[in-house]
């Protein structure tokens, strides 16, 4: 059986990708709650949708099949006849303290067509949408100024993080912050019930019920044998070691994991915000993760004796990559040309977050013009997409895309 998921590199020609078009959840961000929702600004919906549509069309123009999360989730719920079960689980994870409110929300949402229900859950439910008359103390004492019964999920257009394709399977992730933890429920129901994915041979290497955090922006597929995973603000060292044991024990094909330690800060939340693979022997890198002499703490995980994991510490990232990928030479291309001002400015707007759609061909944000021109000087074909509003969410083209199928390199 051929798996519907097949990703054995970061650079193989992209064949199928999962996106989420920004929707009304973006308009439900307010200044009072945007930081808790992990946003630094409020995008303008008509423009962010136009930019995202251009991003999707750019992928289609390059032969990529584009699937949308909201459509797959609704199709899966209907195919599995699990509308009520899915809604119950979503409500239980939405931290609704009042039984009366939860019951009213269930009645409100379950009455909708499935796609409408999915989009409303993603957008969030405001308190003025449902008239709840309750004299229960928990409701009387509720915060009258808070506008939502169910919080919006504006980060959903970053489909890379809730789940990550890996070989002929994927991880469905336990997200770090409460604002994003419900997101991986959509991929869970797709894998369980969608006819294209359920029982079709795709392995779930790690599910969302784990205690330790992991997010797809930290998971890079360097080759059919080697992974790189960031030890970051969003992915723990413990989760990497747990995943290594599963992959090594279950004939995944992966023989080595490079655990790369990066600063635990919002500007560098995932490994792919500071480091991406763009060709067989070329990577982008943000100089801010490198210490003296360009050193980066890297831990090499390999199978050991008696199901143990052998871990080796090195700091010369370039050498580690050369050895792991078995290439004689390798180039780390600095974001913003390594300039002290340009590099952090363009990294903030995801200058390092490139999406390779084929070896040496990348999609980037147009606003990072110094980094883009620098890539061209190294022989990389750069396809720019507009980004004035997309970039406000602090994620780039790689963050906004979850490859499902790549051609083997």
Curated annotation (Swiss-Prot):
InterPro entries: Arg_deiminase. It catalyses: L-arginine + H2O = L-citrulline + NH4(+). One of its GO terms (cellular component) is cytoplasm. The active site is at residue 399. Its EC number is 3.5.3.6. It is found in: Cytoplasm. Keywords: Arginine metabolism, Cytoplasm, Hydrolase. Belongs to the arginine deiminase family. This is Arginine deiminase. The lineage of its organism: Bacteria, Bacillati, Bacillota, Bacilli, Lactobacillales. The gene is arcA.
